[in-house]
Amino acid sequence: MADVGYTSSPAAKEYEAQLGDYFALLKPRVMSLVVFTALVGLQAAPVSVHPVIGFASILFVAIGAGASGALNMWWDADIDAVMRRTANRPIPAGRVQPGEALNLGAALSGLSIMMLALTANFLAAGLLAFTIFFYAVIYSMWLKRWTPQNIVIGGAAGAFPPVIGWVIATGSLSIEAWLMFALIFMWTPPHFWALALFMKSDYDDAGVPMLTVTHGRKKTRAHIIAYTVLLAVLAVGTGFSAIGGPVYLAAALVLNALFLKGAIDIWRRDEDTAIADEYRVEKKFFRLSLWYLFAHFGAILLESALRPFGLGGW
């Protein structure tokens, strides 16, 4: 771990960790997105899976996601202690020792990969292993601290769950799986750059080279609208694929109109206005981005649910 002066207080060292503290290491909010998108990938696949196998497989994907979260918190404990947004996480708050997080993450990683291989197939397990490695090592240990493109490249880690879900069902990769991957991959930069606009001081203090730190807020705003335009083209275009359909397309048109408007509003903002209203527009866009992704994958899920009745898809 890089050292930026992280230490736990004597009182914190006497604290006995509770079950909830260990669960918090797994990043349950992130895990919920992983579970949902993996489930959509599983359900959208053209091959049906026995419910028990499907449930168990998604459970092991969730455990793998939690494992990578624990490894990330172990490695990032020093900068988490500096940032207001993360200072109350279990390790910097002294509720869990770093070694415990490392052991938990390593154990759950091995368990999830092995069990997914036995439950589903080796390709799905291999993709899960790569995802954990990418997030814990490539992103957390390298990209996050060394390049302003950290969340652009690192976004791949969060984009793999629907691909894994698809592979659980089919045992192979296809263009539809990669379209779902691309949706999350292209969504990640504007989502996190919006956060970085109103949390810039946190990244400054921690020495994390987010785009707002290295290039300033003005260029970050321009990057947000550029990626949002590309994302909108991709999202609407997905409506004409095998996982799309009229329901998805209608949802995508509305969602991307709203998202583009939000990005334009951010792009037009001057810094004095943003400071005066405490980044109200940026915070609104950040919240919208969460609903944006859930709604797109919800529409894909609805299309797959309607398809057996002859109502979904084209």
Swiss-Prot record:
It is found in: Cell inner membrane. It catalyses: heme b + (2E,6E)-farnesyl diphosphate + H2O = Fe(II)-heme o + diphosphate. InterPro entries: Protohaem_IX_farnesylTrfase (IPR006369), UbiA_prenyltransferase (IPR000537), UbiA_prenylTrfase_CS (IPR030470), UbiA_sf (IPR044878). Pfam families: UbiA. One of its GO terms (cellular component) is plasma membrane. Disulfide bonds: none annotated. It is a multi-pass membrane protein. Pathway: Porphyrin-containing compound metabolism; heme O biosynthesis; heme O from protoheme: step 1/1. Its main location: membrane. Its EC number is 2.5.1.141. It is an enzyme of class 2 (transferase). PROSITE patterns: UBIA. One of its GO terms (biological process) is heme O biosynthetic process. Keywords: Cell inner membrane, Cell membrane, Heme biosynthesis, Membrane, Transferase, Transmembrane, Transmembrane helix. Signal peptide: none annotated. The keyword Flavoprotein does not apply. Carbon 2 of the heme B porphyrin ring is defined according to the Fischer nomenclature. Interacts with CtaA. Belongs to the UbiA prenyltransferase family. Protoheme IX farnesyltransferase subfamily. This is Protoheme IX farnesyltransferase. It comes from Roseobacter denitrificans (strain ATCC 33942 / OCh 114). The gene is ctaB.
